[in-house]
Amino acid sequence: SVIELGKMIIQLTNKTPASYVSYGCFCGGGDKGKPKDATDRCCFVHSCCYDTLPDCSPKTDQYKYKWENGEIICENSTSCKKRICECDKAVAICLRDNLNTYNKKYRIYPNFLCRGDPDKC
């Protein structure tokens, strides 16, 4: 769920999840146009990951994970929860690995500036 995703973002980036709300064209919704930078591309890939889970509820299904030796370990009983956790883990790692591309000018980015068809997943 968004709760666990938020915790992962804090643990891996030391940024508040609010830093990524309405960032670029893909973080926090929108999902149109082209990613503005590598940080926004992380969110694009995350959206694609969620698209592979049509029978799950990634924004509301709560799952369990461990934070062990600086690593996220997904531990869930159901396939949906495990896969949601893996999608969220991947985006949190991607955001951490691309912290150097984070640009404040893309925070609360106006959605109308996101034009064109998005890349294919």
Swiss-Prot record:
Biological process terms in GO annotation: arachidonate secretion; lipid catabolic process; negative regulation of T cell proliferation; phospholipid metabolic process
Tissue specificity of this protein: Expressed by the venom gland.
CDD domains according to UniProt: PLA2c (cd00125)
Predominant location category: secreted
UniProt xrefs under Gene3D superfamilies: Phospholipase A2 domain
Residue segments, region Important for membrane-damaging activities in eukaryotes and bacteria: 104-116
One cellular component (GO) term of this entry: extracellular region
GO molecular function: calcium ion binding; calcium-dependent phospholipase A2 activity; phospholipid binding; toxin activity
Annotated PROSITE patterns: PA2_ASP (PS00119), PA2_HIS (PS00118)
The organism's place on the tree of life at top rank: Eukaryota
Keywords annotated in UniProt: Disulfide bond, Myotoxin, Secreted, Toxin
Record localization: Secreted
S-S pairs: C25-C114, C27-C43, C42-C94, C48-C121, C49-C87, C56-C80, C74-C85
Subunit and interaction comment: Monomer.
Note in the entry: Negative results: does not show antimicrobial activity against E.coli and S.aureus and does not produce appreciable hemolysis on human erythrocytes.
Function: Snake venom phospholipase A2 homolog that lacks enzymatic activity. Shows high myotoxin activities and displays edema-inducing activities. Has cytotoxic activities against HUVEC cells (LC(50)=2.5 uL) and human lung adenocarcinoma A549 cells (LC(50)=2.9 uL).
Record-stated family: Belongs to the phospholipase A2 family. Group II subfamily. S49 sub-subfamily.
Protein name: Phospholipase A2 homolog EPL_00195
